[in-house]
Amino acid sequence: MSDNQVKIKKQTIDPTLTLEDVKKQLIDKGKKEGHLSHEEIAEKLQNFEMDSDQMDDFFDQLNDNDITLVNEKDSSDTDDKINPNDLSAPPGVKINDPVRMYLKEIGRVNLLSAQEEIELAKRIEQGDEIAKSRLAEANLRLVVSIAKRYVGRGMLFLDLIQEGNMGLIKAVEKFDFSKGFKFSTYATWWIRQAITRAIADQARTIRIPVHMVETINKLIRVQRQLLQDLGRDPAPEEIGEEMDLPPEKVREILKIAQEPVSLETPIGEEDDSHLGDFIEDQEAQSPSDHAAYELLKEQLEDVLDTLTDREENVLRLRFGLDDGRTRTLEEVGKVFGVTRERIRQIEAKALRKLRHPSRSKRLKDFMD
């Protein structure tokens, strides 16, 4: 590995830079030096989600500015972070037989030279389906290498590989060898895009738009950088200052980024309790309130029993004592077959009786 390559790998990327900022930096450097390496492009853009238009536009800009894409001297086809020759399982991930067989199978497929890629691309332009399959098969290792970087984000390793393969197929269909860049460089963005979109769509209980996923990822990078610089968790105001966002927007993004937690999550060493057991139901009555309510019902029933049947039933309907639905004077009048004025008179008489100290004192303690 050359000294220049080591320098590229150790450079730190300002987490506050936008995709356009980084693309401009690359183009400015390419215009100055006349070339850019595939490895440097991959390193600089690795944290951004680029759609097909952005990818094609970027490579078009490189061509328009006569910037040549080259390999790092003495480097492999990709840097150490994306190594298609490494088909081992990601750290901490146990692979089952189907995955092991798949990795073994794609490991038998020979990688392509730059000239072979061009020859296949020419045949693909002519509609050769066999050439499409050959180019895709030769880059399945690349998908595995990229998929490893997304393990632990809510999707199984094999699912990540399958989504990445879909991105690889799109890259095969859209690759334009005449622009001068390697297929692996171009395919990397398609593979990453397919995987990140799948994570946004499938891995979260609540779906987050892809553009918001990129914003969340950027915020997390800024948050981690500030944590290192400050030695403490940064405040929303500090994050907002770095990202040029108001604190309210930062709080909103942080809230969106939170993952839902199941109420069935086991709690304790014995896993005999669940998270939901320790969360208060704000709508449920406390035992003391429930006891007081039941006692009030008993006292109210006793007081109503001192009225005539008609007076009691009128109050029950007017105040919804039985079903919680209050009725108008007219509605109650229809029930008893009398006028609304007559119901008003019965209600007034019944309430006067309830206000008598002999009855009201029994309910007075419940008025607080």
From Swiss-Prot:
Residues 214-290 are annotated as: Sigma-70 factor domain-3. A motif (Interaction with polymerase core subunit RpoC) lies at residues 159-162. Residues 71-90 are annotated as: Disordered. Residues 71-83 have a biased composition (Basic and acidic residues). PROSITE patterns: SIGMA70_1 (PS00715), SIGMA70_2 (PS00716). It is found in: Cytoplasm. Residues 303-356 are annotated as: Sigma-70 factor domain-4. InterPro entries: RNA_pol_sigma-70_dom, RNA_pol_sigma70, RNA_pol_sigma70_r1_2, RNA_pol_sigma70_r2, RNA_pol_sigma70_r3, RNA_pol_sigma70_r4, RNA_pol_sigma_70_r1_1, RNA_pol_sigma_70_r1_1_sf. It comes from the Bacteria. The keyword Transmembrane does not apply. One of its GO terms (biological process) is DNA-templated transcription initiation. Keywords: Cytoplasm, DNA-binding, Sigma factor, Transcription, Transcription regulation. GO terms for molecular function: DNA binding; sigma factor activity. NCBIfam families: PRK09210.1, RpoD_Cterm, sigma70-ECF. Belongs to the sigma-70 factor family. RpoD/SigA subfamily. PANTHER family: RNA POLYMERASE SIGMA FACTOR RPO (PTHR30603), RNA POLYMERASE SIGMA FACTOR RPOD (PTHR30603:SF60). This is RNA polymerase sigma factor SigA. It comes from Staphylococcus epidermidis (strain ATCC 35984 / DSM 28319 / BCRC 17069 / CCUG 31568 / BM 3577 / RP62A). The lineage of its organism: Bacteria, Bacillati, Bacillota, Bacilli, Bacillales.
